[in-house]
Amino acid sequence: MSKAPSHLRVIFTGTPEFALPSLRALAGAVQLVAVVTQPDRPAGRGRRLSPPPVAVFARECSLPVMQPPSLRRPEVVRALAALNPDLLVTVAYGRIIPDDVLALPPLGAINAHPSLLPAYRGASPIQRAIADGQTETGVSIIYQTGELDAGDIILQQRAAIGPEETAGDLERRLADLSATLLLEAVRLIAEGRAPRRPQDHAAATYVGKLTKEDGRIDWQRPAEAIVNLVRAMDPWPSAYTFRAGPQVKTWRARA
């Protein structure tokens, strides 16, 4: 039996600013029974414990927040099960969600990923697409499985990458697009009309987490590749080189 989206009991999992447009959109469309995000981390020069952006926003909206150190703990799984969720929605949570949690909601678990899957599965699809010189990317809404970003596709939309667009610029646009597509996917799921298109796993490509070393400029590479790296590493970790000893960060480049 289908439900109106406003009657769906939804658990949201997400952590960084990228997830905020989606959380904001869902907060006005469904019953958010829990917002699950990562624990507070040391940040800034003083390394003081700071909550992630999703936790800050959720508390401002009086939404119930959970920050478990691990979703694999039995007591955490029991607490989530007690919420009787219909659906689980993930946007950039930053950790693999275990099968025990994915199996809780009867309508399944879905994820917004900022690439045209099966390309750029993994943790840094926006930065890698720019660094590779791609002129197009997009957002995929998929069903979550135990395999990284490998679930069936519900919705997918393309987005151009501007010739001077940085990772920060593109991330903001794709965050908004993710929110729009997620709302549509939730509506289709609630109505029992969500499509499922299997991914071509043979065509999958993978990208890992960014490190500071990824920003180091290799001057032996073509000029266009260096320009793309500078765009891809803005705002973090930033492209850099060394000149007479000190590290020099590079924010803009032209070929």
Give the residues covered by each predicted segment:
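N-terminal beta-loop-helix "entrance" segment that forms/cooperates
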Residues: R41-C61
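Internal anion-binding site segments
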Residues: S2-K3, H201-A255
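Structural motif corresponding to alpha-helix initiation and N-cap regions
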Residues: L20, R48-P51, R73-V77, R95, ...
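Amphipathic, non-transmembrane alpha-helical secondary structure
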Residues: L20, R24, V77-A81, L183
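Donor/substrate-binding cores of folate-linked one-carbon enzymes
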Residues: G28, Q38, L87-Y206
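Internal alpha/beta domain cores that form substrate/cofactor-binding pockets in large enzymes
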Residues: R9-I11, V33-V36, P64-L83, L88, ...
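N-terminal Rossmann-like dinucleotide-binding module
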Residues: S2-G46
